[in-house]
């Protein structure tokens, strides 16, 4: 499902980041040189970016698989088909659930080509932070629901764990690249948390519909950002 979140313009802005910030590569000069160890040179920052990019790719793949499974598995296929039909009919409640993402609040206001690397690194951290609470509660609620297939529950658990580890990687990278940087990690509550915890089955599936739809978009942003930031900060894999 394609979300109405101005994706083309946002991804266009990310691509502009590559071009417009090439002049900022001198920031890489302030990063400690690689550490010499037996067998060659070890660059901890490079390793952290490799880990972050790998986890971002894993998140993207898992979210795509989970999204498809919710539509195809007997556990949720009927509810997701009904919600999709209501979305097509532009039902106001379902339209919001299917097109508005909690993490959309983490996107900075566009300033054309004047994009700051530190700001986008913080934005990546915020995307992970915004996803942390919904994924945590998704695992709890799925574990308590009857008839949840192991394939769905295991993917939800893997998503939560990989997101948490990616958040740790990004926090570490920020402290190494911008040692004096400050970031306020105050993530607002997920709008659909009360729906997910509700005893009303329709409300619960509406929350799952919102989260699975948004994860499909958010994890692609994660992956794109990690590749661009890796290029700009380390000068590798450009």
UniProtKB/Swiss-Prot annotation:
GO cellular component: extracellular space
InterPro entries registered for this protein in UniProt: 4_helix_cytokine-like_core, Somatotropin/Prolactin, Somatotropin_CS
Residues bearing attached sugar chains per UniProt: 61, 210
Compartment(s) where it occurs, according to its Swiss-Prot or TrEMBL record: Secreted
Residues of the signal peptide: 1-30
Keyword Glycoprotein: yes
Entry annotated with the keyword Signal: yes
Protein name from the UniProt record: Prolactin-8A5
Species, as recorded: Rattus norvegicus
Gene behind this protein: Prl8a5
């Amino acid at each position: 499902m394609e979300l109405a979140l101005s994706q083309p313009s946002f991804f266009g802005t990310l691509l502009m980041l590559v071009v417009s910030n090439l002049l900022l590569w001198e920031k890489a000069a302030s990063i400690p040189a690689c550490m010499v160890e037996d067998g060659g040179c070890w660059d901890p920052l490079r390793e952290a970016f490799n880990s972050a990019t790998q986890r971002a790719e894993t998140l993207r793949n898992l979210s795509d698989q989970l999204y498809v499974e919710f539509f195809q598995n007997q556990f949720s296929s009927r509810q997701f088909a009904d919600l999709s039909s209501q979305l097509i009919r532009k039902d106001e409640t379902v339209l919001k659930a299917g097109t508005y993402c909690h993490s959309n609040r983490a996107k900075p206001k566009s300033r054309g080509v004047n994009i700051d690397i530190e700001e986008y690194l913080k934005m990546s951290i915020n995307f992970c932070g915004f996803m942390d609470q919904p994924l945590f509660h998704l695992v709890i609620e799925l574990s308590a629901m009857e008839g949840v297939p192991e394939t769905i529950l295991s993917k939800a658990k893997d998503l939560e764990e990989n997101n948490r580890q990616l958040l740790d990687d990004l926090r570490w990278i920020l402290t190494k690249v911008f040692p004096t940087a400050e970031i306020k990690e105050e993530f607002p509550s997920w709008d659909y948390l009360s729906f997910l915890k509700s005893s009303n089955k329709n409300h619960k599936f509406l929350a799952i519909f919102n989260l699975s739809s948004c994860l499909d978009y958010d994890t692609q942003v994660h992956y794109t950002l990690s590749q661009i930031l890796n290029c700009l900060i380390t000068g590798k894999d450009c």
